[in-house]
Amino acid sequence: MKRALSRVVIASSLTMACSVVFTANVANAAGLPKPDAAKGEQLYLQGEMSRGVLACVTCHGDGGNSIIPVNPSLAHQPYEYLVKQLHDFRAKDEKSLPSRRGPEGANSLMAAIAAGMTEEDMQNVAFYLSQQAVNWEQAANATKEDTMERGQKIWRGGLPERGVAACAACHSPDGAGMPGQFPRLAGQHPAYIAEQLKLFRSGDRANGPMMHDIADRMSDADIAAVSDFAAGLR
């Protein structure tokens, strides 16, 4: 009974937190110029080498449907979420580090690319990607039957005994994500999901305090199981 109650409390608290963040993001977006999907597509396909901005399609695939397991699929991800991530790859000033870094704090290729992007670039390419359809025929899927039950348990109910909330509370039961803040994980590469959870856990990805707290209470086996399960959601 106590475990069931804890699960409800955690899920309810996270849902409220998600709603607050979403509302804040929408409010902050008010008054900004409307993003241009056509310009975003041009940058996505061609890049801008004069500023060190590589063509996004090289790593993230046609229409944001990546076929490279370590590179995320970005098709139909929330616009606000994508803009925030691009910002987080950049350092706020010369004395600080980006809040999104690779293993052991190393800067990723995205840090160099984001440094060459303007605010308009970020908004345009994010808007373009948010409108792209997911290619479900080539999307990643669950492949590990032996961890399916464990992954499903964590996704739907979390690990209340360790304070790990249900992933579904913010990423939705079907993995579609939450508009404005939380990404789609359905069809995402499990290797990428697992890597990000480990980066949250280590603190090398420092742009999500709530995710750090969650990942810090998960074992490698937990991470592998729920990452594979999430990939298979539709």
Q: Which residues fall in each region the model found?
A:
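The feature marks the first
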Residues: 35-95
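C-terminal segment of classical bacterial N-terminal signal peptides
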Residues: 14-28
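Disulfide-stabilized extracellular ectodomain repeats and their linkers
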Residues: 41, 53-56, 71, 79, ...
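Short microdomains enriched in Cys/His and/or Lys/Arg
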Residues: 78-89, 189-201
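Electrostatic cytochrome c docking/interface patches
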Residues: 27-50, 131-160
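Axial heme c-ligation environment in periplasmic c-type cytochrome domains
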Residues: 67-75, 89-132, 137-141, 178-184, ...
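Bacterial N-terminal signal peptides that target proteins for export
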Residues: 1-15
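The canonical Cys-X-X-Cys-His
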Residues: 40, 53-63, 125, 164-174, ...
